[in-house]
Amino acid sequence: MNLKLSAIESYFFHRSRLNLHSCFYVGIKLNELPKKSQLIAALKYTVIQHERLTCNVFYDELKKENFLQNILEPLKFCDLVEYRHDWDQLGETEINHIFQRYNFSYNENKPLWKILILPNQNQMLLLTDHVLMDGMSAIHVWETFMEGLQMQQPVEIDETIYSPSLNSSTEKIMSAPLYGDWPIPWNWHIVRQLVSRLHYWFPQTVVKNNRNLIQFANYSFPKDLLDDKPSDGTQKYKVKNTNHQWEFRLSPTHLNDILQECKANNTSLTSLLGALVCTSFEKIAAHEYTGSFLKIELPMNIRKPFERVLKLPSDDKLAVGNFIAVIEFNHKLHQNRGIWDIASQIQRAIRSSSEDKIIDKVNEVKLLEVISSQQYIEDKISLNNGPSSTFEVTNLGFQTFKDACNTSLPFYIVDATFNEPQGISSIFSLSVISTPGNGLHCCISYPNTLTKVLEPHWQYMKDYLNLY
């Protein structure tokens, strides 16, 4: 494999290379942990199905470009799996430790992912560099892993999970999957030219936040985000990753009741969560922030739009990779509007972006093709007094992992979790995933300098969702 990075993958690459993003994780909890030999067999099966798992990003000196290429050395079990016998839980300390300590290097014959196993919790966490895959990809990887785990296979003694193929060729260069085929209307050709020139000559016109965007008095950016920032051109940034982590759950019955309410109001769970955060923000004392509106970022899975617009067969071609666009929604405060009214507005924005405006949404992502991703990232930090959005809601949805939650199986998924590190794009984040056995699992990550400030905010959410 010799694959060009898409524009968004190039953005993720530079963000990680600057040390501004370590990894994210999607984890599963099993009824019991497999034996090592069973893990080896399942991993071999998974790696065969998803070639990207055998790749790293390498710089081609001749072409002066980065490519996703197959690793040229074997990968052993110990390269991909680490046991954490010392962790009795996945709490705030452990979560922040993951984002502080686990990251991945480029231009090396090493993987861009790892599985952490917490034996005391029967839990397995897939940690991955974002350049390799998005959140839905991690779901697909776990689905494949569980398929391999259920198969009756010979006992594995050889711990080599991957061996470079003698027949594999790195000569043929493949374009970034599908993004290169996406239609660019004439007006977007004009926008691309304009953005390219503006970012080069007047970067603030492209990256500067609206001055009315909410910023907290107790959150100084980038001071409360970074421990270090480059001073001599060689030093990297260092993100604190000391966020407070609050997790809440909704039982399957409770989740079903809320989903029925969403259905009755023609909204989705994602829209409701976004509206709930907007409404609860009204409980925060006005002197704690400046600005008049919140901005929500809602990452959108664009696999189905790709299939629809490019007339692709519905297969596993889009299983693992980065196929996301971001929906932005602005909410003006103090409008005295109800939760379902706000949720309906958010839902309209989601529906419009995923249907009528999907050509535009993907072309917004493709604007990263015409600017320097690295400069854009650095400008976002140096030219602003806060992240570009107030909060992010990423909902991976209700996942059965292709029936891997079926309790009649020898190994089945009991629960799932999902989380991401402190970042440059939002002040706090909600990472959500739901399963049949344990319902909804939401991880909320926010700066520890805002713990007291946000107490009324979270209390309102607890009261609304009956989290007692």
Curated annotation (Swiss-Prot):
<keyword id="KW-0256">Endoplasmic reticulum</keyword>
<dbReference type="InterPro" id="IPR052058">
    <property type="entry name" value="Alcohol_O-acetyltransferase"/>
</dbReference>
<comment type="function">
    <text>Confers resistance to the sphingolipid biosynthesis inhibitor drug myriocin (ISP-1). Inactivates ISP-1 by converting it into N-acetyl-myriocin. Cooperates with YPK1 in mediating resistance to myriocin.</text>
</comment>
<keyword id="KW-0808">Transferase</keyword>
<dbReference type="GO" id="GO:0005635">
    <property type="term" value="C:nuclear envelope"/>
</dbReference>
<dbReference type="GO" id="GO:0005886">
    <property type="term" value="C:plasma membrane"/>
</dbReference>
<dbReference type="InterPro" id="IPR010828">
    <property type="entry name" value="Atf2/Sli1-like"/>
</dbReference>
<dbReference type="GO" id="GO:0005783">
    <property type="term" value="C:endoplasmic reticulum"/>
</dbReference>
<dbReference type="Pfam" id="PF07247">
    <property type="entry name" value="AATase"/>
</dbReference>
<dbReference type="GO" id="GO:0008080">
    <property type="term" value="F:N-acetyltransferase activity"/>
</dbReference>
<protein>
    <recommendedName>
        <fullName>N-acetyltransferase SLI1</fullName>
        <ecNumber>2.3.1.-</ecNumber>
    </recommendedName>
</protein>
<dbReference type="GO" id="GO:0009410">
    <property type="term" value="P:response to xenobiotic stimulus"/>
</dbReference>
<keyword id="KW-0012">Acyltransferase</keyword>
